[in-house]
Amino acid sequence: MDLSQQDWKTKLDNDPNAVILDVRTEDEWNEGIIPNAILNDIYKGQGFLYKLDEFDKSKNYYVYCKAGGRSAQACAIMNQMGFETTFNLEGGFSQWKGDVAFRDEN
């Protein structure tokens, strides 16, 4: 399900069963993330699918990429794999107005 930036954040903030999934590349990830996100680069192909297999399908997944296209594709793949609830962030990280975390450089 596609959600606006505000609806995505509101649902996320009130969802104890939430998992944030970033499907961008590692280079994009290094430029900043939505706090507590898990990286699973959709461009990894089979590696992306293998990592999805390790996730709990009953959780609620809040998925984002840079602009919303890859995350929409990821949500469709996840739904086909049996994930019950996925939310795509419309506009992606490029339009994100919420908190941003950066990878620890230590």
Predicted feature locations:
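Rhodanese-like catalytic fold shared by cysteine-dependent sulfurtransferases
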Residues: M1-A18, E26-N60, G69-N106
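Short, surface-exposed ligand- or partner-binding patches at beta-edge/loop junctions that are enriched
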Residues: V63-Y64
